[in-house]
A protein has these predicted regions:
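Small/aliphatic-rich secondary-structure junction motif
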Residues: 1-54, 159-210, 224, 233, ...
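Structural beta-alpha unit
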Residues: 1-2, 15, 22, 66, ...
């Protein structure tokens, strides 16, 4: 896996600043180009929406775009990193559409976004934008919540991030295979420890539970070949209970720096590997979540 270009949408909030700092760290590590995108949704501004003439609307439009560009320049200056190649992009339109369009145009390998991390997924930093981007993006989407530990990923003084412990959640489906490969690649890149987690959410009868756990454990042990990944530090974990609760609990216990999950990317996000679990983990988890499309 190669990360040559990272796209980071910016709305100038503390949440997008957090995601941008994380993106800077990754760009520095992978020697990747970082594209900072700000989307101007002019239709949200009453002064432009109620313009009485086309000329007046164009004046408002130009002013909003110019102001967005100036704000983006100032934002990037506050998070300077001379070693990283950056590009600033200001687009007019609907946030999710422009993010996806920019990702396609620039052939982004990763999209990094921030969220409030509050209860209710509709309270994401970009509203339903993160939802739409996760479902439609062809590249992985890194979601950095306000609950994420600032020291989660610490490689440089300017961008204190490092990846020492990665947690991969799997249900053994084909959809989670790409997430596994991605997690392994990142773990090898950072010489990180990787923990493979499976949650037995619908536990069978007590008499059958032991054999079910043993069968799942056997599948976990086969996911990564120690012979093919000799330098990789591999752990496995089996849990019984509500998936999101067990994932969040283990991530905190293990002090995971990154949680990797697979998503279908089609239809409602309820079709994600863990259904609504992905949402809940993003709300409650203390580390960034990397959603990898199947």
């Amino acid at each position: 896996m190669q990360i040559k270009l990272i796209l980071c949408p910016i709305d100038f909030s503390e949440f997008s600043a957090r995601a941008y700092r994380y993106a800077l760290s990754l760009a520095e590590h992978y020697h990747a180009k970082l594209v900072a995108l700000h989307v101007v949704e002019i239709w949200r501004h009453p002064s432009a929406s109620f313009s009485t003439t086309a000329d007046l609307y164009q004046k408002f439009r130009q002013a909003f775009l110019e102001n967005g560009g100036l704000q983006l320049q100032e934002f990037v200056k506050e998070h300077a990193s001379p070693e990283i190649q950056r590009e600033l992009v200001v687009q007019e339109g609907t946030a999710a559409d422009e993010i996806l369009s920019c990702a396609r145009t620039h052939r982004a390998d990763l999209i990094a976004m921030g969220t409030h991390g509050r209860r209710g997924f509709d309270r994401l930093m970009l509203g339903s934008v993160t939802d739409r981007v996760m479902r439609a993006a062809s590249c992985p989407v890194l979601v950095v919540s306000s609950r994420s530990r600032d020291a989660a990923v610490a490689a440089t003084e300017r961008h204190p991030h490092r990846l020492d412990r990665i947690l991969l959640c799997t249900d053994f489906s084909e959809n989670s295979e790409r997430a596994l490969n991605y997690a392994v690649s990142v773990a090898e890149e950072y010489s990180a420890e990787i923990t493979l987690l499976n949650v037995l959410e619908h536990a069978p009868a007590p008499a059958e539970q032991k054999s079910a756990i043993a069968a799942a454990q056997k599948q976990l042990d086969k996911l990564i070949s120690p012979e093919q990944h000799k330098s990789l530090k591999i752990k496995t974990a089996m849990r019984v209970g509500k998936a999101y609760e067990q994932i969040v609990k283990l991530a905190e216990e293990a002090q995971s720096d990154l949680l990797v999950v697979g998503v279908h990317g089609r239809g409602a996000l309820d079709a994600a590997i863990f259904g609504s679990t992905t949402y809940r983990v993003m709300q409650l988890g203390s580390c960034p979540v990397l959603a990898v499309p199947a």
